[in-house]
């Protein structure tokens, strides 16, 4: 298919000023760019007068590695202009095989257990290498491109080190370390683009730091990028630790989902500013360090998942798991005992306090801003606990506990009730989003699975709106359009080592987006999280139109991009 885009205001992804131009696309590539192209015939011509042509957006932190198999249409990415996902973040990668991926992911992410096991249990999809995973994805014909990483959790688990509790923490045995290094090398040989880790999740939190650094030296050997989910999600201590480890290993560093929620109390330093200062110092000292930022920062907690998953219960209430209870029903029955219920309340308080110290969120004061959705009582729908407390004369904290235990007739909920903590709305954190996102070393990211999470689980607002919101936050606060587009295109492509996409240039792959620069922005919010972005007209992937004048075309021309190799052929 050939395509001619005429009369466009071209923003090329480099940060350079826009220019007027026509762009001719053929055989997946940008063949020609000129002020006017009138001497070629194309299968399709798009008049982009009044619109802006940009490279396709690159999401440097996606969690689409599992959901893409079942939802290859990837609507949430396409409708906000994303044409390439980097996947396998936070150490959970589909490499080296499906069984290891499932084992490590579901052991930690309790809320993912049911979805992944239900979908994969009876599916025909299986793989035993990165190459085979790529073939599985291509057999599903993805709408956009994906770029896989190697993950620490998957590597150490496959190597035989399977820590599940603090008592399992130890140095890896020489044979385990040798196997882990071989797995990393093999992943890179098969085309993985980098290495991801985390320090907050099982089993990664029990790995000895020196062992992580030893594995990072292999990443440096192959000149790949390290993508850490740092300790306590980018607290100053976590950022400092990541920088120190990167220096010791000599590896290029990209810090994942930089935390914009400060942990501060009156008279103390905003920890977001402190963490940014640590990054600046490292950069001044010559270190290659970058980071990404979620443009929405809210958390969604289905209470039925919180209370109905005993593994998650044991994690949330580590000091007082459900004593003697073998089922959720037994636990709920036991919770009717006031003494036991108060024990659980006190444990929750301790958990919230620890989380506030570590991460800077889950303050008790946030409870009055918690929003309820999918309730069985329409009088509760969309209201906050603060509003309900005011209406009914209760306390937001007690109402939250009543909701979890489902004992209050006021807050009697359906099994699918959702609790949202809107952590960048209504609190003085919005400025931190701007501060971090406008930083010269930052790029926006989504940090969620693609379209297809369970209906009963509310979408994180980033799922459909991270990039349009990031654009609006920047442009509406005086950042030049060209710089905002660069952060979503050419810059993340450079960070990950992608050389044939991210820019509107002759010879580059034709991943392109056409937007209305005034209207482009999020259509969603914390409650209506799945509303599509405004002001996006066309999305083109590998030269084919996947969104045509605002409508999805059902084209799925995406590819699995493997470093140093040609694209994986379609099945």
Where are these regions (language model features)?
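Divalent metal-coordination and catalytic microenvironments
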Residues: 8, 23, 28, 50, ...
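Acidic, glycine-enriched loop/beta-strand segments at the rims
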Residues: 10-22, 415-427, 433, 480-485, ...
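Active-site neighborhoods of metal-dependent hydrolases
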Residues: 133-137, 142-162, 167-176, 180-202, ...
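Glycine-rich, proline-tolerant flexible connector loops at the mouths of alpha/beta enzymes
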Residues: 94-95, 197-207
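Histidine-rich, glycine-flanked metal-binding segment
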Residues: 1-3, 10-56
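C-terminal cap of metal-dependent C-N hydrolases
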Residues: 351-354, 434-441, 447-449, 459-461, ...
């Amino acid at each position: 298919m050939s395509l001619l885009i005429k009369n466009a205001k071209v923003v090329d992804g480099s940060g350079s000023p826009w220019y007027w131009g026509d762009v001719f696309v053929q055989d997946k590539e940008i063949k020609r760019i000129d002020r006017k192209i009138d001497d070629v015939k194309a299968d399709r011509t798009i008049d982009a007068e009044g619109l802006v042509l940009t490279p396709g957006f690159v999401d440097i932190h996606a969690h689409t590695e599992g959901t893409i198999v079942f939802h290859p249409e990837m609507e949430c990415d396409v409708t906000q202009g994303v044409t390439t996902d980097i996947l396998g973040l936070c150490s959970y990668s589909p490499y080296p095989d499906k069984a290891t991926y499932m084992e490590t992911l579901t052991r930690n992410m309790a809320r993912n257990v049911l979805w992944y096991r239900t979908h994969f249990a009876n599916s025909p999809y299986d793989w035993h290498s990165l190459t085979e995973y790529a073939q599985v994805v291509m057999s599903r014909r993805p709408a956009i491109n994906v770029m896989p990483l190697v993950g620490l959790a998957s590597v150490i688990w496959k190597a035989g080190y399977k820590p599940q509790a603090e008592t399992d923490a130890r140095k890896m045995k020489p044979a385990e370390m040798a196997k882990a290094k071989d797995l990393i090398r093999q992943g890179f040989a098969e085309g993985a683009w980098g290495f991801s880790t985390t320090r907050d999740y099982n089993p990664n939190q029990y790995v000895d730091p020196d062992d992580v650094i030893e594995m990072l030296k292999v990443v440096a050997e192959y000149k790949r990028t390290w993508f850490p989910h740092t300790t306590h999600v980018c607290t100053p201590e976590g950022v400092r630790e990541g920088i120190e480890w990167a220096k010791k290993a000599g590896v290029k560093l990209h810090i994942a989902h930089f935390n914009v929620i400060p942990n501060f109390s009156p008279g103390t330093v905003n920890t977001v500013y402190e963490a940014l200062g640590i990054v600046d110092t490292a950069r001044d000292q010559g270190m290659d360090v970058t980071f990404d930022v979620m443009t929405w920062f809210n958390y969604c907690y289905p209470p039925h998942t919180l209370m109905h998953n005993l593994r998650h219960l044991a994690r949330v209430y580590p000091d007082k798991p459900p004593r003697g209870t073998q089922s959720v029903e037994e636990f709920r029955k036991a919770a009717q005992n006031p003494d036991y219920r108060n024990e659980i309340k006190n444990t929750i308080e301790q958990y919230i306090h620890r989380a506030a110290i570590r991460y800077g969120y889950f303050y008790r004061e946030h409870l009055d801003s918690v929003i309820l959705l999918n309730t069985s009582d329409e009088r509760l729908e969309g209201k906050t606990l603060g509003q309900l407390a005011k209406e009914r004369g209760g306390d937001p904290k007690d109402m939250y506990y009543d909701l979890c235990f489902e004992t209050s007739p006021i807050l009697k909920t359906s099994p699918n009730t959702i609790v949202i903590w809107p952590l960048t709305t209504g609190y003085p954190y919005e400025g931190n989003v701007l501060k971090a996102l406008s930083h010269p070393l930052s790029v926006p990211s989504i940090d969620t699975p693609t379209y297809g999470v369970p209906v009963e689980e509310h979408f994180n607002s980033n799922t459909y709106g991270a990039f349009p919101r990031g654009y609006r936050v920047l442009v509406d606060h005086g950042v030049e359009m060209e710089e905002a587009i660069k952060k979503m295109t050419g810059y993340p492509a450079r960070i990950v080592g992608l050389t044939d996409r991210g820019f509107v240039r002759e010879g580059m792959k034709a991943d392109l987006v056409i937007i209305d620069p005034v209207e482009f922005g999020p259509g969603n919010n914390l409650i209506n999280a799945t509303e599509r972005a405004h002001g996006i007209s066309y999305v083109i992937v590998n030269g084919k139109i996947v969104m045509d004048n605002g409508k999805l075309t059902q084209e799925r021309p995406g590819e699995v991009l493997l470093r140093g190799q040609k694209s994986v052929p379609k099945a």
